[in-house]
Amino acid sequence: MPNILSLTCICFNSVLYPTSFFFAKLPEAYAIFNPIVDIMPVIPLFFFLLAFVWQAAVSFR
């Protein structure tokens, strides 16, 4: 029961403060990875585009 309650609180908190999820800062030790972390959400789109390029290369068989 406490797990469900804590999960509910976490979800409710993320709804109240959605910008804190997107603009969270990395710890100081990992600051060098900031540019990589900024690009990471876009990586799945590259695979999606790669599928179209691949299909175009094989003439959409």
UniProtKB/Swiss-Prot annotation:
Q: Name one Pfam family in it.
A: PsbK
Question: What processes does the entry annotate via GO biological process terms?
Answer: photosynthesis
Tell where it localizes: Plastid, Chloroplast thylakoid membrane
Keyword Plastid, does the record have it?
Answer: yes
Q: How does it sit in the membrane?
A: Single-pass membrane protein
Q: Which residues cross the membrane?
A: 32-52
Predominantly, its location class is plastid
Superkingdom, taxonomy of origin:
Eukaryota
Name the residues of the propeptide.
1-24
Record family assignment: Belongs to the PsbK family.
Q: How does it assemble?
A: PSII is composed of 1 copy each of membrane proteins PsbA, PsbB, PsbC, PsbD, PsbE, PsbF, PsbH, PsbI, PsbJ, PsbK, PsbL, PsbM, PsbT, PsbX, PsbY, PsbZ, Psb30/Ycf12, at least 3 peripheral proteins of the oxygen-evolving complex and a large number of cofactors. It forms dimeric complexes. Detected in both etioplasts and green leaves; PSII is only assembled in green leaves.
Can you name this protein? Photosystem II reaction center protein K
Q: Which gene encodes it?
A: psbK
